[in-house]
Amino acid sequence: MVNDRLYICYCDNGYILIDNTINPYCLLINGSTSPNTTTTIIINNTSNNNNNNNNNHMNWTIPIVIIVSIFILLIIGSISLYLYKKYCSKPKRVHYQLIR
């Protein structure tokens, strides 16, 4: 029972909600579906907890991937601009000196 968690379950329109998600375990244990009622129960680690953890992980993964990809694009762009200026652009002074 070390992994047990304390939940506050809200009954909204006949569904028991935990963290704004419908939880059938809370509905089975509570048994009350009257509107606007609040009950506090203890539920052990179920698959719903794992789903919540995965959702939180996914919520952080997408912005991190976007930020890392933007930094990679900036690095590639700066390297390509540096190489273009170094090897492809011709200075005008050297060009005029070659003509004379």
Swiss-Prot record:
GO terms for cellular component: membrane. Its main location: membrane. Keywords: Membrane, Transmembrane, Transmembrane helix. The keyword Membrane applies. It comes from the Eukaryota. It is a single-pass membrane protein. The chain crosses the membrane at residues 62-82. It is found in: Membrane. This is Putative uncharacterized transmembrane protein DDB_G0291932. It comes from Dictyostelium discoideum.
